[in-house]
């Protein structure tokens, strides 16, 4: 049974709950459900970048926008410095959020095989699928978050077989009673199974 967290029950100076992860791990859907459960605004960093003119160019080869990170930081700061409201912030650039404003950072992880299927269904190009699968195997989003915030603020959740509502409910519980951070290591698992080379390019 889900427990509702009232935004008035927290005396906090940190205003942001972050949801990050490789494309395809479920960030946007989980953030929307969590925002609804907590009755707080959800900020998509991708949309924020577009709205503030922070997409400086387009990388045609990688089929993605190039983000002006300084511009995006300037757009983020006024949002998180408003201590009167709590936010859920999701996206691929959560490490740009000032650490002092972060309550918790949740990194969504997905088994590389499941991630490949999801990105294929989305119509991603083969090169972009491989790039994102490699990033997931290597734990790039995990490492970026740990580098940006204190390790005890960073939690990982396996979304391979878990629906967005269930992930949001788990995050809600972890906000109330934070467990010891769990680290998901696809590299170790794949290496143990003798499959790591199948997922990484030279």
Task: List the model feature ranges, each with a label.
Residues 30:
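Hydrophobic positions on the alpha1 helix immediately C-terminal to the Walker A/P-loop
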Residues 57, 109-153:
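A glycine- and Lys/Arg-enriched "phosphate-lid" helix/loop adjacent to the NTP-binding pocket
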Residues 146-202:
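NTP-dependent small-molecule kinase module
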Residues 41-97, 190-195:
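ATP-dependent small-molecule kinase phosphotransfer cores
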Residues 22:
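P-loop (Walker A) phosphate-binding loop of NTP-binding proteins
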Residues 14-16:
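Pre-Walker A (Motif I) flank of P-loop NTPase domains
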Residues 19:
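Hydrophobic anchor at the beta1->P-loop junction of P-loop NTPases
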Residues 27:
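Conserved lysine of the Walker
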């Amino acid at each position: 049974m889900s427990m509702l967290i009232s935004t008035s029950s927290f005396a906090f100076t940190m205003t942001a709950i972050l949801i990050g992860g490789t494309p395809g791990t479920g960030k946007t859907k989980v953030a929307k459900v969590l925002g609804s459960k907590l009755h707080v605004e959800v900020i998509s960093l991708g949309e924020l970048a577009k709205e503030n003119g922070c997409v400086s160019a387009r990388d045609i080869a990688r089929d993605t926008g190039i983000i002006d990170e300084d511009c995006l930081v300037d757009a983020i700061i006024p949002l998180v410095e408003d201590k009167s409201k709590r936010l859920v912030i999701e996206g691929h650039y959560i490490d740009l959020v000032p650490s002092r404003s972060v309550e918790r950072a949740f990194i969504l992880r997905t088994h590389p095989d499941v991630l490949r299927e999801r990105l294929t269904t989305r119509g991603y190009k083969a090169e972009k699928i491989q790039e994102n699968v490699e990033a997931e195997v290597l734990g790039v989003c995990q490492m970026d978050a740990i580098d940006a915030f204190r390790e005890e603020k960073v939690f990982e959740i396996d979304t391979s077989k878990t629906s967005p509502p269930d992930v949001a409910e788990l995050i809600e519980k972890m906000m109330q009673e934070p467990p010891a951070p769990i680290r998901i290591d696809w590299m170790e698992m794949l290496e143990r199974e003798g499959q790591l080379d199948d997922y990484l390019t030279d």
